[in-house]
Amino acid sequence: MKLEKHMIDTVKEWHLKIGYQKENIRLYYPTESVKDFLDVKNSEKLSTEELCDKVQSYLSEKMIGMGTVNVSQEENRFCIEISKELNEYIAKHIEPSEFLQEFLKALSSGNIEIVRHLFRSYAQQKQGHCIEEPHEGEAGIAFSFQEERIDPYVYCVEQGDFGLTYHRFVKTEYEKLF
């Protein structure tokens, strides 16, 4: 997955969950995640400043005509600040994921079986396969699709005192954690 796709997907997720606000948005990424997104090998000995410049240059090129981003780095994470113009561009010109919309609706039911049914039926509808992995503890059940064309993320859904909660991971990050 590319960094710009993850950024846009995250902003669209926020728009669906809390609504669009014409303001700057800050996204935080661990340094290792940024390296993965940009295919920077550990053997490449980039200083923090060089990596920060590389991210800034990469995103400036990818976001031409949409708005600006500013990249900073502190300790082991990067802050990517999306300008209100880019946020507005994403809100007006990029459609939200159909699956994510359906997922959030299923999640609001508070019923894990409705979420499970969504993943299974969506996979079947798109001629794909649903993957379901139960985890002990706070990860709950991890749902994903074998085919990334359907949706490239892993959704860890957990039943708690206040209903269903979830965390969405890029598959490579999920594999590192579990």
Predicted features and spans:
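Positively charged, polyanion-binding regions of nucleic-acid-associated proteins
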Residues: 1-27, 37
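Charge-rich, solvent-exposed alpha-helical interaction surfaces
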Residues: 6, 10, 37, 54, ...
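Short glycine-rich, basic-tinged beta-strand/loop micro-motifs
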Residues: 21-41, 101-106
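Charge-enriched amphipathic alpha-helical scaffolds
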Residues: 25, 35-68
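Charged low-complexity interaction tracts in eukaryotic proteins
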Residues: 58-96
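Negatively charged, low-complexity tracts enriched in Asp/Glu with abundant Ser/Thr
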Residues: 97-135
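Short, hydrophobic/aromatic-rich segments at coil-to-beta transitions
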Residues: 137-143
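Intrinsically disordered, low-complexity regulatory segments enriched in Ser/Thr/Pro
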Residues: 148-178
